[in-house]
Amino acid sequence: MKSLNRNVKEVSFNVVDQKWIIRVVDSHDPHMVVDGAVCRGCTWVGQSEIYMSNELTERTFKRVLLHELVHAWLFATQMSVPDAFNEEQLCDFFAIYSEKILDLANKIEQRFFSNEDNSSI
């Protein structure tokens, strides 16, 4: 199992033509605490930022990253209204964006777990 490249602190990327930044931070960073609970990942849609804990294994990192990227995509596509989001919309969202989200997650994971220092995708 690979470990995080400590030289890479953040990676920038685009979601539907919106610039986003993902940062790996200490698990007790203020951005990682929501309603008093420490999170493994957190998406701040107003700032177009995703924060990930530096204590995650590669496998857990990928799962949490995918979860947070879905939040970003929902916000960027304006589909993030929970009361109005039904099963058909969920299936459409998955059909339209799942390959793009997975492809981006793979690229981000490679940046954080390789020896490359490039911080942009």
Model regions: which residues?
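Metalloprotease/metallohydrolase-associated module, dominated by Zn2+-dependent proteases
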Residues: 1-59, 76-121
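Active-site recognition of the HExxH zinc-binding catalytic motif
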Residues: 63-75
